[in-house]
Amino acid sequence: MLLARIKQLREELNIQQRQMADAIGVDAPMYSRIERGIRPFRDEYIAPMAKILKIDKDELRSLWTADKIINVTKDESDSVAQRALHLAKSE
């Protein structure tokens, strides 16, 4: 979700990967690996990416959080995952 959205926005705005890399303080090959999901996405990338992509930080953070939830619950049945989300919401 997150990485696909970042790539979509980057391409729509004609932003090169090297520009994104500069914004988050990594080299272009590392940025490419991040965008492809080979290297982990870090919290510290959210603010500079949001700025260059002209998007709200909360949208990126929400997508990142959704990806983490999906990753944690991907091996669980839908009912177990839904119950876990319900329990987490009630806390």
Q: Which residue ranges define each predicted feature?
A:
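A short, Lys/Arg-rich alpha-helix, primarily the initiator
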Residues: 1-12
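Alpha-helical residues within the helix-turn-helix
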Residues: 11, 22, 51
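Short alpha-helical DNA-recognition segment
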Residues: 14-33
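DNA major-groove recognition helix of helix-turn-helix/homeodomain DNA-binding modules
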Residues: 25, 42-62
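Short, charged recognition helix plus adjacent turn
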Residues: 61-91
